[in-house]
Amino acid sequence: ATAYYHWDGGGCGVFFDRCGKIAVELEELRRRYPGLPVVLIGHSYGGSCAVEVARRQSVQAAPLCLLTIDAVARRQKSVRPACAEWWGNAYLRDGGGFMDAVPRIGGRWGHCAGADANLAFSGYSRDRKGRLYSHRRPAPMLYEPPGEEACSLFQAAASWLERNLPD
């Protein structure tokens, strides 16, 4: 099953978000299907919301993998949620140009000490399509590795999911 939520959970921005609503719905899903692993993905403020949603989850429910892509939020610390079995974090470490004002103002998390993997992308480097990595185009930070030596967040999450799917 797949569920998509607006970056603020359908609320009114960062001060009146609905991350709590998402957390309740996810907890219900995890309790209904206790052996089914969950992959929770968030980009920008959605990354911050994903961490908050994960923080509110029961540790005993279904296994949870957390992926954050260039997470942004000054009001929340990027502390590892207890229920996250695996946390992958990708972020833009530099560059980004003029259009990167939102994450700079909002407070880009960057490297998260509690994450199992931190993939740092340079805004001066180009993705496979030849475009500069940027906050407003998160897909390359999910599907591409930052260098030849690493795997992508998507590949890492797929491996985690494969290990956690019931027989």
Language-model regions, residue ranges each:
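Gly/Ala-rich beta-loop-alpha elbow adjacent to hydrolase catalytic centers
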Residues: 41-46, 50
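Active-site catalytic motif of lipid deacylating hydrolases and related acyltransferases
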Residues: 1-36
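C-terminal catalytic-base region of ester-bond hydrolases, centering on the histidine
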Residues: 80-167
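A general structural motif
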Residues: 35-37, 61-63, 84
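Alpha/beta-hydrolase-fold catalytic nucleophile elbow
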Residues: 67-70, 90
